[in-house]
């Protein structure tokens, strides 16, 4: 699988006025990407971030009046835990986005964490992705990503093997004591629209490194996500403090 990155990727930093504004703008950006995709194709495929930061955005997004029955919802990464585990990203999506009307009509494709090993789960997820997005490289219409204070995104953690994987669409990640299943950098980079959601003062230095063209990508793996188009970064004031506009 070719790693289709683009050195000329541009970052567009948008600083929200409040937590509510950050959630609203994130929902609007994702909804706009879905709208654009459905104007051109029968179905839209989106890959969403897990964790706590996007919860409010998903509640906003779930109320957007879109033809959700034509939307496939996937995850950028998942912890290898049971689907009802409190740390499950799938559970979080079911409790937020997919609990809303009309988004409950979307077709959700969780990572199959019920397989006997993380590797088996990754293989099953890759097979589902290949069936859903046929072609040499799966291409999502929208990818929403978070940013860790260590510079990771999805489960591409610095100092692990996952950021360097470029020969498959899904791989095993390791971070914070749990095995994880994650989309790889080539798949994230192939997306038609890439959005980062960054919140909190603890993310300030990681965001500065993401925006620094001299920063080594393997030290800040979020820099491996290099689509052909613009990357939108939605941040709150704490995360964006003292940063130049990108």
Give the residues covered by each predicted segment.
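N-terminal glycine-/serine-/threonine-rich phosphate-binding loop
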Residues: 1-46
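Class I SAM-dependent methyltransferase SAM-binding "motif I" and its flanking Rossmann-like core
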Residues: 142-186
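A glycine- and small-aliphatic-rich helix-loop capping segment at beta-alpha/alpha-beta transitions
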Residues: 60-68, 91, 158-166, 213
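Ligand-binding beta-strand-loop-alpha-helix segment within the catalytic cores
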Residues: 2-10, 69-144
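Glycine-rich beta-strand-to-loop/alpha-helix junction loops that act as flexible
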Residues: 48-53, 145-149, 199
């Amino acid at each position: 699988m070719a790693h289709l990155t683009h050195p000329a990727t541009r970052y567009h930093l948008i600083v929200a006025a409040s937590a509510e504004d950050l959630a609203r703008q994130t929902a609007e950006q994702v909804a706009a990407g879905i709208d654009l995709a459905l104007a051109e194709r029968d179905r839209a495929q989106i890959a969403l971030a897990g964790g706590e930061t996007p919860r409010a955005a998903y509640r906003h997004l779930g109320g957007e009046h879109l033809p959700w029955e034509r939307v496939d919802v996937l995850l950028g990464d998942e912890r290898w835990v049971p689907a009802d585990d409190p740390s499950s990203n799938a559970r979080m999506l079911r409790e937020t986005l997919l609990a809303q009307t009309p988004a409950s009509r979307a077709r959700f494709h969780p990572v199959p964490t019920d397989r006997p090993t993380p590797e088996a789960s990754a293989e099953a997820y890759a097979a589902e992705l290949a069936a859903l997005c046929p072609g040499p490289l799966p291409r999502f219409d929208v990818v929403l990503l978070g940013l860790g204070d260590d510079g990771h995104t999805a489960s591409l953690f610095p100092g692990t093997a996952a950021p360097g994987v470029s020969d498959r669409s899904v791989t095993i990640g390791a971070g914070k004591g749990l095995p994880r299943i994650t989309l790889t950098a080539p798949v994230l980079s192939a997306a038609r629209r890439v959005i980062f959601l960054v919140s909190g003062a603890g993310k300030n230095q990681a965001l500065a490194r993401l925006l620094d063209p001299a920063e080594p990508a393997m030290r800040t793996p979020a820099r491996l996500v290099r689509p052909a188009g613009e990357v939108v970064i939605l941040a709150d004031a704490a995360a964006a403090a003292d940063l130049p506009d990108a």
